[in-house]
């Protein structure tokens, strides 16, 4: 579960290492984001020479969440960290590689490019 001021690890090669959530997309009163939800974030830590710089405002999709997500069969999928992938306005990833596993819920939310780039889908 991600809300405003939550810091997330970046799971792609855009150059950002850590982002801070500043808004959850999907309505003016929406408070929480889970796996597959889009957030607006600012880059808090970045590597030199990357696509994004520190202070940039970006859109990102949550790919791993400590809170986890409930599946149709009643099971839960949980991760050890909160992580996101930076996306463009057309919902495609800005980077060319995805690091670490991603949840199967991204396929239901139509983030096929992220699912295909990910090394493991849980």
Curated annotation (Swiss-Prot):
UniProt keyword annotations, A-Z: Ribonucleoprotein, Ribosomal protein, RNA-binding, rRNA-binding
InterPro entries to which the protein is assigned, alphabetical: Ribosomal_uL14, Ribosomal_uL14_bac-type, Ribosomal_uL14_CS, Ribosomal_uL14_sf
SMART domains, alphabetized: Ribosomal_L14
Listed GO CC annotations: cytosolic large ribosomal subunit
Record GO terms (molecular function): large ribosomal subunit rRNA binding; structural constituent of ribosome
GO biological process: translation
Origin superkingdom: Bacteria
HAMAP family cross-referenced by the UniProt entry: Ribosomal_uL14
Function statement: Binds to 23S rRNA. Forms part of two intersubunit bridges in the 70S ribosome.
NCBIfam families: rplN_bact
Family label: Belongs to the universal ribosomal protein uL14 family.
Subunit structure: Part of the 50S ribosomal subunit. Forms a cluster with proteins L3 and L19. In the 70S ribosome, L14 and L19 interact and together make contacts with the 16S rRNA in bridges B5 and B8.
Protein name: Large ribosomal subunit protein uL14
Gene name in the database record: rplN
């Amino acid at each position: 579960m991600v809300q405003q001021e939550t810091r997330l690890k970046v799971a792609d090669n855009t150059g950002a290492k850590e982002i801070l959530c500043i808004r959850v997309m999907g309505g003016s009163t929406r408070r929480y984001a889970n796996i597959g939800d889009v957030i607006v974030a600012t880059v808090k830590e970045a590597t030199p020479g990357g696509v994004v710089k520190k202070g940039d405002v970006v859109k990102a999709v949550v790919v791993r969440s400590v809170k986890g997500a409930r599946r149709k069969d009643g099971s839960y999928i949980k991760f050890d960290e909160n992580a996101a992938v930076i996306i463009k306005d057309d919902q495609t990833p800005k980077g060319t590689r995805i690091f670490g596993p991603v949840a199967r819920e991204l396929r239901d939310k139509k983030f096929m490019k992220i699912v295909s780039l990910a090394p493991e889908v849980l």
